[in-house]
Amino acid sequence: MTAITMVVLPLQAQDTTAHRDTVPAVPPAPSIEQLQYMDGLKTVTRGVAQLHDGLSRVSRTQQADSATRHHAAKRLGGLCGTARSFIVSGRPKMKPSAYSDSLRILAKQLTLRLDTLTNALPICERTAGRDPAVATALTTKLKSYDDALLAFKTSQAAFYRPDSAKAQPPTPQ
């Protein structure tokens, strides 16, 4: 025989107070200088994509015959010229003074790495078809730029994201 025991707990008072909806804090709107910086970065990114394409072609053809490798290296030289035109047109808009504090430091690092990359492009244009070391040196500079870009974008995303601790609705008591 089974006995079932029921326990009745007293009803707790229902919370009848109206809770205000909490809206997450709106991140600050970017300034005109910051918009110009991002516009310049967008243009620069087109040039960097050209470099990635050229270096990718060179690395894919390393196991191919010498004529294919030579063709890929010459193509890299041409893409270095195209990339340089995009980078040179976008770089003047990228003024690190558009940002403050740590974001300014990262923006400055990004522009310095971009300038280093830009300085290597004329050599790439002239000698990429003859000297395979050009692709190696360019890959190193491009990796350095990509790391700086990642740090800048990560910091920028964290800066413009609303604080999740402040956006939580109050818990009922």
Q: Can you describe what each PLM-predicted range is?
A:
Residues Q14-G78, A151-P172:
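Immediate post-signal-peptide N-terminus of mature secreted/exported proteins
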